[in-house]
Amino acid sequence: MSALQTAFVSILSVLLVSVVLFAVYAVRGALLIRSSAADGGWIGRIGRTRDRDVQRWAFVAHRVTGMAIFAFLTLHIFDVALLAVSSSRFDNVHRLYGTAPMRVFESLLCMAILFHTFNGLRLVLLDVADVGVVTARRLLNGSVALTIVLGALTSVVILRPAI
């Protein structure tokens, strides 16, 4: 692995660690909100449906996938900018995209993009149209189902050359 590829993988690793740390921070915050006294504690949760918790986790997942997409786009801008510096350096870095670990990463990134897209469309629909709790739950289930189905299909396409 060349020095440029090592630098690219190092920066990608730092970005992935920052996304994971952000995810841990967001999940920790959601758990603290869930267990706080302001939320009514366990007594307050007795009469409440679980939809509110599911919506909160969808919100956390939306934030985490947004952070992951932003981190990748930032890195991708820099790796495409290498073309202005030297085409050999650009080709050197882009050889990494054909490796099996990067194909797995691209597959996960594609699933993050799908979830972020479908959940974002769901949130826009919830803001624009005053739908009820049942419809909101169905929309979330639909966005998760679409993410799983389309994510599996795209993963097969992305991972096939690496297998």
Indicate where each model-derived feature is located:
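Membrane-embedded alpha-helical bundles that constitute the cytochrome b-like, heme-associated redox core
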Residues: M1-I163
